[in-house]
């Protein structure tokens, strides 16, 4: 399992060909920025003759360092008072020259962590903790896929303004496409008429797609280009309302 996981990580970084996000003390629109690109500017300034001189840092020194960083359970990130939506930030954006073949790396790391936790259990406990053996089903059916900026076209940023999502991001050796890993309720699933396992005699239920903020290269109505937090579909949740008159 460990060898399989490392193989997936290597293939993941091989197709990504993009720089990671780094900490930046930017107020208002969050604290993450892609290195080598200015936070704000015009589209011409990003694709001009000097664009190639802004070198991008390497992805990571070693794969072990990346895994250790992302799986660090002792790292407790608290949202600031100025930005109370910090718990909605996700890592569902990738810059790549081709459609990613795997879910975001953090999803794979979470699965690997669950595997390590299960490896420490006894065989009997492991059998009983398997969701398939317990007959567990999701309350709402969902579907996840990578979508491009060309499919999204526009999005809503943190200030409530509608911005244009740029399809390509300029880098020293050309351009990379922006991909977004979106999760939404499955319209063809068995829960399109209501949530699974809900007592319909007492409750009205509905599976509803919810959104979170991700960082993306966008352009506002004044043609200003910059990295902003926008909303994308990230989950499918069950909403309940009690039936009246009972």
From Swiss-Prot:
Domain of life: Eukaryota
Single Gene Ontology BP annotation: nerve development
Keywords attached to this entry: Cleavage on pair of basic residues, Disulfide bond, Glycoprotein, Growth factor, Secreted, Signal
One GO MF term: growth factor activity
Disulfide bonding pattern of the chain: 140-207, 185-236, 195-238
Propeptide section residues: 19-127
Full protein name: Neurotrophic factor BDNF precursor form
SUPFAM superfamilies: Cystine-knot cytokines
Listed SMART domains: NGF (SM00140)
Endpoints of the signal sequence: 1-18
Glycosylation sites: 120
Family of the protein in this entry: Belongs to the NGF-beta family.
Keyword Glycoprotein: yes
Keyword flag Secreted: yes
Gene name as annotated: BDNF
GO CC aspect terms: axon; cytoplasm; dendrite; extracellular space; nucleus; perinuclear region of cytoplasm; synaptic vesicle
Entry's localization field: Secreted
Function: Important signaling molecule that activates signaling cascades downstream of NTRK2. During development, promotes the survival and differentiation of selected neuronal populations of the peripheral and central nervous systems. Participates in axonal growth, pathfinding and in the modulation of dendritic growth and morphology. Major regulator of synaptic transmission and plasticity at adult synapses in many regions of the CNS.
